[in-house]
Regions:
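Walker A/P-loop nucleotide-binding motif
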Residues: 106-128
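Pre-Walker A (pre-P-loop) alpha-helix and adjacent loop at the N terminus of AAA/AAA+ ATPase modules
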Residues: 82-114
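Loop/turn-to-beta-strand initiation segments
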Residues: 140-141, 175-178, 207-213
Length: 265
């Protein structure tokens, strides 16, 4: 997969945000146990599981997935100037994204996500990475793939020298707390590729795992800047699952104010 030797940007991020991800050999990210996943009470001579146990186990299972945030978006947070500027143009959309990020643990525990539909340059990728950063800072496991890169990674998993075989790689993609998919539908998948995407999305749907995605394609009803809808590009089965998992947040140019974004609980 090529993740064993991270580039400079990836190393820098792992030294920063990613050192907060729970690991089997790391100290407790919550500071509640000694790093072994158990909270002991010397007075009663008892022990109870630490909440980091579940995240440590997930971190082990999802090692090897791509999870770096690109340099362009690494500084993006809830109150970044770029987010504030976007909020002036698309208040409902930014409010939905912020609400999701502020309640990241609850959202991931429920398996809810968001889908950002919009023209290039409207801020959808920025909001997606704002959410992913919140998940990382909360100690949750994440995987970040562009649609073309994900398809390439699936093909690579068939190679004899692959770090993870096909089955193991798909299991990791299903198991990670948050899967961010950028440019979903950027290329028309073959029948084989469409089936792989369905297996991933359906697996996450059944496991109540969150998906945050971005796409330049129109909403299911045809609303948006592109002639083709996301459902037409990736297929009705995948779109049906995503529709339940990740409510669409439209960001289409000058018409942003006229759209309604989902109001998360």
């Amino acid at each position: 997969m090529g993740t064993d030797t991270p580039n400079t940007e990836t190393r820098a991020l792992r030294d920063g945000l990613f050192n907060r991800l729970p690991d089997a050999d790391a100290a407790c990210p919550y500071g509640e146990c000694e790093g072994d996943g158990w909270i002991t009470d010397e007075a009663t001579k008892t022990a109870r599981p630490c909440k980091c146990q579940k995240q440590r186990a997930s971190a082990r299972r999802t090692r090897g997935l791509t999870r770096e945030i690109p340099e362009r978006y690494r500084h993006i947070g809830l109150d970044s100037p770029e987010v504030e500027e976007l909020a002036a143009r698309a208040p409902a959309q930014v409010r939905s994204a912020r609400r999701y990020a502020e309640t990241i643990d609850d959202q991931l525990d429920k398996g809810t996500g968001l889908g950002f539909h919009g023209d290039p340059g409207t801020g959808k990728t920025m909001l997606a990475f704002m959410i992913t950063r919140s998940a990382i800072e909360a100690g949750r496991t994440v995987a970040v793939y562009s649609f073309p890169r994900l398809l390439a990674a699936i093909r690579d998993s068939y190679r004899d020298d692959a770090t993870d075989g096909y089955g193991a790689f798909l299991d990791k993609l299903v198991d990670v707390d948050l899967l961010q998919l950028d440019d979903l539908g950027a290329e028309r998948p073959t029948e084989w590729a469409a089936e792989q995407i369905f297996l991933i999305i359906d697996g996450r749907y059944e496991a109540k795992r969150s998906v945050v995605y971005t796409t330049n394609l129109a909403l299911p009803g045809g609303e948006g800047g592109s002639e083709e809808t996301l459902a037409e590009r990736i297929g009705p089965r995948v779109m049906s699952r995503l529709g339940e998992m990740a409510p669409p947040v439209p960001l289409f140019g000058a018409d942003q104010r006229s759209h309604l974004a989902p109001d998360l609980p």
